[in-house]
Amino acid sequence: MSEWEPSTVIGRKVRIGGGGPRQQVARTQGQINEARRSGMVLSVDKKYGTTNSKSSPEGQRLTKVDRETDIVKPKKIDVSVGKAIQKGRQDKNLTQKDLATKINEKPTIVNDYESGRGIPNQQILGKMERALGIKLRGKNIGEPLGGPKK
């Protein structure tokens, strides 16, 4: 049998000639740099998965943002929501600091939300709605909050 004839090898996980480089996960920046220097095929992906918790669409949005080339600004609170927070706070004679302690947040967060600079967080908005007794999400922003559903 000459070297140039194809040979058939039977078995599990058989590699002829030692096979090629196996796929491996680089855990450090040094390993990534080493792979780049040696000219190996390289794919750098972030993993946004968690094991025992409910997945949130935030990871999908982060992946989408990572893959896009243009700059995407994060969402901000609408100015009408900020005005409603300010009006509701003043109706109850609360300072920003008082409202912040009532909802267990920092006064800077209340300030950011009132000025329209804050990044919307449903938990914080829910706490503010209950503390002020007005709607801050959905339609009819600024209207009194209805009682619990029966």
Curated annotation (Swiss-Prot):
Belongs to the MBF1 family. Transcriptional coactivator that stimulates GCN4-dependent transcriptional activity by bridging the DNA-binding region of GCN4 and TBP (SPT15), thereby recruiting TBP to GCN4-bound promoters. Involved in induction of the ribosome quality control (RQC) pathway; a pathway that degrades nascent peptide chains during problematic translation. Required to prevent stalled ribosomes from frameshifting. Residues 96-115 bind DNA. The keyword 4Fe-4S does not apply. InterPro entries: Cro/C1-type_HTH, Lambda_DNA-bd_dom_sf, MBF1_N. Keywords: Activator, DNA-binding, Transcription, Transcription regulation. Pfam families: HTH_3, MBF1. It comes from Kluyveromyces lactis (strain ATCC 8585 / CBS 2359 / DSM 70799 / NBRC 1267 / NRRL Y-1140 / WM37). Residues 1-29 are annotated as: Disordered. SUPFAM superfamilies: lambda repressor-like DNA-binding domains. PROSITE patterns: HTH_CROC1. Residues 85-139 form the HTH cro/C1-type domain. Gene3D superfamilies: lambda repressor-like DNA-binding domains. One of its GO terms (molecular function) is DNA binding. The gene is MBF1. This is Multiprotein-bridging factor 1. GO terms for cellular component: nucleus.
